[in-house]
């Protein structure tokens, strides 16, 4: 199944490159790619320099394929039961990512979300929409379109491809909505061992 999905993704990428990203069928273009890799605990140990190099490598791997949006999320929390990330560590992680993002260049819009619990995030987004005082319609009706827009923001299109760094037996806990209609590709390699060559292999 994974091989078949990857073959379909490759075919779509080749068509997008051959036509310069232009096609009569919008479904043939990869507009949004999600990469789920590493645990939140591993992310915390990443320096600003490592984040800069990692994000730049990701952009360089997907940009030639015409990708407009790249979202990066952890696979899981990586913490033992009862173990949590401290506020100081979370603040340091957010700062490292923000500083690294300033050095990312290219035509791809990059979104990095450090939340590892996709179900918790889903509930928080739903509650936020229902309690939105500026939108009276949200109190009575919550449409699929509004929910998708809030979950994917600032990206404005559903993911076409989800690349998971890890074995195909483990789905990312950070993704709930994004995997429903996306093609899944698994690359069984650790976060710290990931290189630009691995990313190129995954999307080539």
Predicted regions and their residues:
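Flexible, compositionally biased loop and terminal segments
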Residues: 1-204
């Amino acid at each position: 199944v994974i091989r078949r999905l990857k073959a379909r993704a490759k075919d779509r990428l080749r068509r997008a490159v051959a036509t310069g990203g232009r096609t009569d069928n919008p479904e043939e273009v990869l507009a949004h790619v999600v990469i789920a890799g590493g645990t939140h605990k591993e992310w915390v140990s990443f320096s600003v320099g490592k984040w800069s190099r990692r994000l730049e490598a990701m952009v360089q791997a997907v940009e030639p394929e015409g990708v407009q949006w790249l979202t990066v999320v952890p696979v899981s929390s990586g913490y033992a039961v009862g173990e949590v990330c401290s506020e100081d560590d979370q603040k340091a992680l957010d700062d490292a990512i923000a500083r690294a993002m300033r050095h990312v260049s290219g035509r791809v819009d990059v979104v990095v979300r450090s939340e590892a619990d996709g179900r918790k995030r889903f509930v928080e987004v739903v509650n936020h929409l229902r309690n939105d005082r500026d939108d009276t319609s949200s109190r009575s009706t919550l449409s699929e379109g509004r929910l998708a827009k809030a979950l994917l923001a600032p990206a404005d299109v559903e993911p076409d491809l989800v690349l998971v760094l890890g074995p195909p037996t483990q789905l990312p806990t950070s993704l709930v909505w994004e995997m429903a209609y996306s093609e899944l590709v698994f690359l069984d390699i650790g976060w710290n061992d990931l290189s630009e060559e691995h990313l190129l292999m995954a999307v080539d």
